[in-house]
Amino acid sequence: AGFAGDDAPRAVFPSIVGRPRHTGVMVGMGQKDAYVGDEAQSKRGILTLKYPIEHGIVSNWDDMEKIWHHTFYNELRVAPEEHPVLLTEAPLNPKANREKMTQIMFETFNTPAMYVAIQAVLSLYASGRTTGIVLDSGDGVSHTVPIYEGYALPHAILRLDLAGRDLTDHLMKILTERGYSFTTTAEREIVRDVKEKLSYIALDYEQEIETAKTSSSVEKSYELPDGQVITIGAERFRCPEVLFQPSMIGMEAAGIHETTYNSIMKCDVDIRKDLYGNIVLSGGTTMFPGIADRMSKEITALAPSSMKIKVVAPPERKYSVWIGGSILASLSTFQQ
């Protein structure tokens, strides 16, 4: 969250709400019945953490309201009734989700005006393009959105309910095979950190597995909060491989490369060349080292042989949706 015209968000915190799982015994500690974001993160050892947003759709509106309240009053320190608000959502989200968002903004926070933008479109804005196909992958949902001369092509938008949280869950599971047990909601956050710091995408998965078997070159160690050190090897690339092979976690979906290709194929034959040459990655789950090369390799294999494929992975892509929103909201034409 932040202000239009800024080049980076002022506040970045996880969309989590934590509630104590023990009864408070010390009086006057100012204990709250719920903690949001970073504060929930720092006290996670005694809390049960819940995510109000699942697969890009808000499933718990009371908690979502807490998160917005925290954003306005504690993080940005603004009165929401004095500022128009730009919110974002995943494409193909249920209409009811958007209506409820709007209702809460106007009725609870009394915002003077609001707009709900599609995430992927904002990422393309941020990359300085008007034509391209965006693969946006966050915590709960991934989607591919082809955009031509500023128009999103709704019939060709594809959505994949596979994203960061599923990768974290998968890593929790494969670390169990190594004899490390992570089960609680707080431990899941530790595994998420392991994923973000150590995972990478193999250019050739089968070959990487062979390398991992024979040498210890892929092994890295990670220190847990209690000082215990764990070693992680092939898990580093087995975790995000799920993006390309969803069948690894029992999902019947196409991988991100195939979804991108399918999305391009749903577009008019005349504009495909422009899309192949402008594949833009966005969102935290596209931050894995090696993703652009692998994506390029996989799509080259699917596309016509003479086609020029270009995968763009901007360094700020973790926040490119926000940056695009900042650009959009500061345009004078938009404000009218």
UniProtKB/Swiss-Prot annotation:
GO cellular component, as recorded: actin cytoskeleton; cytoplasm
Segments passing through the bilayer: none
InterPro entries attached to this UniProt entry: Actin (IPR004000), Actin/actin-like_CS (IPR020902), Actin_CS (IPR004001), ATPase_NBD (IPR043129)
PROSITE patterns noted in UniProt: ACTINS_1, ACTINS_ACT_LIKE
Note: There are at least 13 actin genes in potato.
Described purpose of this protein according to its UniProt entry: Actins are highly conserved proteins that are involved in various types of cell motility and are ubiquitously expressed in all eukaryotic cells. Essential component of cell cytoskeleton; plays an important role in cytoplasmic streaming, cell shape determination, cell division, organelle movement and extension growth.
Full protein name: Actin-66
Organism: Solanum tuberosum
Upper classification of the organism: Eukaryota, Viridiplantae, Streptophyta, Embryophyta, Tracheophyta
